[in-house]
A protein has these predicted regions:
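Proteins enriched for Cys/Gly/acidic motifs involved in redox and nucleic-acid/cofactor modification
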Residues: 1-73, 82, 86, 108, ...
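Short, solvent-exposed loop/turn segments at secondary-structure junctions
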Residues: 72-74, 201-202
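Intrinsic disorder/low-complexity segments
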Residues: 80-106
Length: 202
């Protein structure tokens, strides 16, 4: 289950970081996070929105949603619901995961991003970090449509070599990364893009 106590980080009186998940289900060759923090655990959706509402009442206007792979938010909630008849009661047990369609019994990260941006008093919403292989069009849609969501995408590339990316176990090619960035820029022409590059792997 998700920890009941989390560290609170404030960059300033107007900004706060909100942890939406812990752990990671990826197996990147250079990263020890899965070994030390375990599998991904998503924080309940309603709990997250409630925290942002409370922060807004305290005067916070800028939120950064934080996770090792924010785009996989809610995936574990789906696994908990698998094989269970989805009802209001069962949904509450896993943090209000709901059925948007027959194959998506969970809130997507884009749903959470939109809900946080709609909280009264919140003026800017950022997030970090997404994984290129899990970046969904719905997330870019929200960034393009919702003015409170900042038009900044930090998308770690790690390497421009497909051979190195394969050795890193990243799950995408350089061309696939470029395709995702191009699709994002098609919707958000002024998109600010930042990345991470590892030099000298391994």
């Amino acid at each position: 289950s998700f920890p009941s106590a989390l560290p609170v980080k404030r960059d300033a009186n107007h900004a706060a970081w909100v942890t939406i998940q812990i752990g990671c289900d990826n197996s990147c060759a250079f990263c020890i996070v899965p070994s030390v923090r375990g599998r991904e655990i998503s924080r309940p959706y309603r709990e997250l929105v409630n925290e942002v509402e409370q922060l807004a009442m305290e005067g916070i206007t800028e939120i950064t949603l934080l996770g090792q792979n924010v785009n996989s938010y809610g995936r574990d909630l789906t696994l908990k619901l698998r094989g269970t008849e989805v009802s209001a009661e069962s949904s509450q047990l896993v943090g209000e995961a709901w059925v948007r369609g027959p194959h998506t019994p969970r809130p997507l990260f884009s749903d959470l991003l939109r809900s946080v941006a709609e909280v009264s008093g919140i003026r800017r919403v950022r997030y970090t970090s997404p994984h290129p292989k899990d970046l969904r069009p719905e997330t870019i849609d929200v960034m393009a449509q919702v003015p409170e969501v900042c038009e900044h995408l930090h998308l770690p590339l790690q390497s421009g070599s497909d051979e190195v990316l394969s050795a890193m176990h990243r799950g995408y090619t350089a061309d696939r990364y470029v395709e995702k960035v191009a699709a994002a820029r098609q919707q958000i022409p002024d998109l600010a893009l930042s990345t991470d590059i590892i030099v000298g792997f391994p």
